[in-house]
Amino acid sequence: MDPCECTKSGTCNCGGSCTCTNCSCTSCKKSCCPCCPSGCTKCASGCVCKGKTCDTSCCQ
C-alpha cells in the first residue's frame, strides 16, 4: 500500500481502492491520482508530480 500525501484539502487513497477526491497533493506516489497528469511517465519509484504539471522533476 502506497498512500498519497495530501497536505491540503481533499482526500487521497492510493491503496487497493485507489480513490482521490479534490486532490490537492503536492506529492503523489501513484499516477492514479488526478494530481498526476495522464501523460506523466510512470517510473519504478512511482510518479512524483509537483503541482498539476508534469516536468523533469515529475519522476525522481
Swiss-Prot record:
Residues reported in the UniProt entry to bind a divalent metal cation 3: 14, 18, 23, 28
Highest classification ranks of the organism: Eukaryota, Metazoa, Chordata, Craniata, Vertebrata
Note on domains (UniProt): Class I metallothioneins contain 2 metal-binding domains: four divalent ions are chelated within cluster A of the alpha domain and are coordinated via cysteinyl thiolate bridges to 11 cysteine ligands. Cluster B, the corresponding region within the beta domain, can ligate three divalent ions to 9 cysteines.
Official protein name in the record: Metallothionein B
Region Alpha, residue ranges: 29-60
Annotated a divalent metal cation 6 binding sites: 36, 40, 43, 59
Residues where a divalent metal cation 4 binds: 32-33, 43, 47
Residues where a divalent metal cation 1 binds: 4, 6, 20, 23
Binding annotation for a divalent metal cation 5: 33, 35-36, 49
Gene name of this polypeptide: mtb
UniProt-listed PROSITE patterns: METALLOTHIONEIN_VRT (PS00203)
